[in-house]
Amino acid sequence: MRRAVCPGSFDPIHNGHLEVIARAAGLFDEVIVAVSTNYAKKYRFPLEERIDMARETLASLRGIVVEPVGEGLLAEYCRQRGVSAIVKGLRSSSDFDYELPMATMNRQLSGVETVFLPTEGHYLHLSSTLIKEVFTLGGNVSDYVPRSVLKRLLAGESS
C-alpha cells in the first residue's frame, strides 16, 4: 500500500488544502491528513475542532485518514506509519524555498520523499492566516472555505 501524509495545522482547513489533498488521494492508496499543533502559533480553533473540520470536509474522499500528529519529528511519524511520501502544496517560489530544506532533512532522516503539488491558480493566494484575517475584518470568505468551516467561523464570531 502506498501511503502518504499531508501535514498541516489546518486552522482552518480551506479549499486550497482540499484541492491538494484530493489530488494526493488520486496518487496514493491512503493519505493521512496529519493535523499538527505548533506551540509557537496562536490558533483560532483547538486541535480537536480542526480535526473534526478536516474529517467533515474530507468524508466523501476515499482513502483519507485524519489524525493528530503528536510532538516530534515528521520523519519519525512517517517511519512509524509506513509513509512513503509527504505531500505539500506549493503556492509560490517562497513556499518552495521554505519547504525544500525540510524535505531534504526528512529524506535524510527517514528516507521519505516529499512530493510537491503546485496549487491551482485560483487558490494561489489562499492561506489559513489570510482567511482568518479577512474574516475577522468582516470580509466574505465563503468562496474559500467549505460550508461547514464557514458555519464554525460564524458560530465562533458570536461567542
Curated annotation (Swiss-Prot):
Pathway: Cofactor biosynthesis; coenzyme A biosynthesis; CoA from (R)-pantothenate: step 4/5. It comes from Arthrobacter sp. (strain FB24). Its cofactor is Mg(2+). The gene is coaD. The record marks H17 as: Transition state stabilizer. Keywords: ATP-binding, Coenzyme A biosynthesis, Cytoplasm, Magnesium, Nucleotide-binding, Nucleotidyltransferase, Transferase. ATP binds at S9, F10, H17, G89, L90, R91, E99, Y123, L124, H125, L126, S127, S128, T129. Homohexamer. Reversibly transfers an adenylyl group from ATP to 4'-phosphopantetheine, yielding dephospho-CoA (dPCoA) and pyrophosphate. Belongs to the bacterial CoaD family. InterPro entries: Cyt_trans-like, PPAT, Rossmann-like_a/b/a_fold. It is found in: Cytoplasm. One of its GO terms (cellular component) is cytoplasm. Its EC number is 2.7.7.3. Its main location: cytoplasm. One of its GO terms (biological process) is coenzyme A biosynthetic process. GO terms for molecular function: ATP binding; pantetheine-phosphate adenylyltransferase activity. It catalyses: (R)-4'-phosphopantetheine + ATP + H(+) = 3'-dephospho-CoA + diphosphate. This is Phosphopantetheine adenylyltransferase. PANTHER family: PHOSPHOPANTETHEINE ADENYLYLTRANSFERASE. Substrate binds at S9, K41, L74, K88.
